[in-house]
Amino acid sequence: MEEIEGIILRHSRRGMSELSDCMPGDFCAGAAREVLTWPRGCVAIATGFCVAGHAETDGPPGAAWVARALEELGFAPVIVTDALCRGMFERENLRVEYVRLDAEDGELRGILERLRPVGMIAIERCGRTAQGDYLNMRGVDIGAHTAPVDRLFELTDAPTLGIGDGGNEIGMGMLAGQLAGRLVIRPCAVRTDRLIIATVSNWGAYGLCAALERLSGRRCLPSPDEAERQIERMVAQGCVDGISHMQAMSVDGFDMATEAEILDALRGAIGRQKGEHAI
């Protein structure tokens, strides 16, 4: 049976599947095992990637499902983002911490002191290059629209996990050397303790949920219908596809049928039957 890591790397378009050779074979399961060792408390989940002045559909939906999974496991998740996602997560009954565009280290340390996270997870959140730029996949600097959420991952003493799909996201600094020769743009330099790579970052988030469910026995992974409704709600609030820049029911150019394929495969990998709902 195909493992979680192989499922979330299906349909690879940007070389992530080739990078799996640089990763532990069980990188998703290993990340889930570590998360389950964290003391129960606040987990900060960073997300929100600026595309044409809007948040993209990749990232926030996956972050919402990881947050729900963590709640099921006894954690207290907090979404950490910027004004790009204002209002989205409150509608999901999730706690949110907003970071200002011009926040400096003192303010960021204050956020960490207030939250006191036992762990931090980034899901499709842009991180700085070694030159200090925030670059999208077209090589355009989006720093004017991107709060320094990545700096929290450098300032914290808590364990960290990054989920990305292109090379410019928080956590991809772990593979900066390998990415440098493969990307047109300069890769993110911000490292995390653990990294999950996927064709789509939402799929990486689903992979984490699947691994958490398999290890804990608790319902963590959404059904295809649940995931589609989550994306629909966020599109209604202004999220756009990262490829087409359109406010549409797609993620990085993949339609909902492909989303369902990935989720059904993950459900099969952990022994869950179709029709069984999540939390």
State each model region's role.
Residues N93-V118:
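A glycine-rich helix N-cap at a beta->alpha junction
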Residues G74-D82:
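Short internal beta-strands
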Residues I170-I279:
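C-terminal functional extensions of proteins
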Residues E56-F75:
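Histidine-anchored nucleotide/phosphate-binding helix
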Residues C42, V118-G119:
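Structural motif
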Residues L19-M23, F49-P61:
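Short, glycine-rich nucleotide/cofactor-binding loops
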Residues G59-P60, G119-M120, R125-R218:
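Conserved mixed alpha/beta catalytic, RNA-binding, or beta-rich assembly cores of soluble enzyme
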Residues M1-C42:
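Positively charged, low-complexity intrinsically disordered leader regions
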